[in-house]
């Protein structure tokens, strides 16, 4: 963030946040699809602290399924350099479900002309091996409970849909 701030202190940032449990599961699925992840999802989650404790490398970050979902730490780093007026945080689920409305809000924030209609096409779609199981969902719900509450406070959001 400091390098961006040094480059352009007036820059406007748009940040997209996804339900951290869904993000973790999608991340794991991508690693499985690329044959980089030997563990089942729950084992991978429980092994994560050991795996990412290595010196920071791209390889170790590949397995940061949970760690990357602690958005408040990342946002605090952003807000250390940029005032909130320069940062527009978007909930991924709003973008997915109300794409044009969400994009119009982003365009307005950026001060640019809105596009009449944006083509709706998903990118980087990887077929999921399976859906997330109830035990895994419960585990992640407990892991992210305090984080989600902190985000609700920090952003003034209702994240009840992230608590399931």
Where is each model-derived feature located?
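PAPS-dependent sulfotransferase catalytic domain
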Residues: 1-39, 57-101, 146, 153-155
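The conserved 3'-phosphoadenosine-5'-phosphosulfate
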Residues: 10, 72-150, 157-164
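Residues that form generic nucleotide/phosphate-binding pockets
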Residues: 27, 44-47, 139-143, 154
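Core domains of carbohydrate- and sulfate-ester-processing enzymes
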Residues: 37-51
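Surface-exposed cleft-lining segments at the edges of enzyme active sites
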Residues: 53-67, 125-136
